[in-house]
Amino acid sequence: NNLHFELRKLTKRSKIKMSFDYDAIIIGSGMGGLATASLLTQLKGFKVLVLEKHFKVGGFTHTFSRHGYKFDVGVHYVGEMQPGSRSRQLFDLVSGGAVDWAPLPDIYDKFVYPDFTVCASNNRAVYINELVNRFPHERSAIHKYFKDIDAVNLSIQTKTTASLLPGVLAAPVNAFNSAFNKLAIISTADYLNANFKDNKLKAVLVSQWGDYGLPPSLSSFAIHALIATHFLNGAFYPTGSAETIAQSIVPIIKGAGGDVLVNHGVEEILVKNGTACGVTGKDQSGTTFRFTARHIISYAG
């Protein structure tokens, strides 16, 4: 929804009186760049150019092969890809429905510690029961925890919806967003320490902290809740490896007259009358290129 709002804003920018090679140029072909290119192509009818410095598109969806086996560099599993979910619907739009998602087995994760192991089930109720049976003295805190992460997840969705509304309408929606406002400002560690006594249980609940990149002492509980709820219906993997994601999007861009160029490193964004209007850089051979567009979007990472 936020992305759709940004796409709408693109059409409201002041127009520069000059001819352009493309409607939009996107720097970087990671999933953010490719998703934006796909949506601009499909929803706005844009002719889009994607420029990638690397020799492959796709960002962390890259794969490589060794001795006949294929390995992913970034994608381990993805949550909320069950048919009918919001994430699946959005992804099907971005990919043209060309990516199939295979559910991982019932036990999709095992959290192995020196003296105990906990299995994460793709069935929410089964997972909660596993935690309660293993840590019965924390029963009430466990149930409260799941209510809290649900509340935060709902609040984030509400906050996203509010961002699409005019200010007068958004204000009361944000005012009632109490769960997000309260829990987003505390760390994951602070929440756990305030609600749980068992250190082993605390460790289990944050076993997936690597997915959001910060340890519990530094991460917002709201972000933790977003990731935790993301996997409550299990995990999925793209059939045929993660590279099928980029492979599904590139034809959408090219089919509308756009281009996706690898080995093209952007060195400068051109600006005219205070507005970005093009890019220059060099390709693999060292040849300088120059492209212009009404909209310049950078996903360089």
Language-model-detected regions and their locations in the chain:
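Extreme N-terminal leader/targeting segments of oxidoreductases
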Residues: 2-24, 42-45
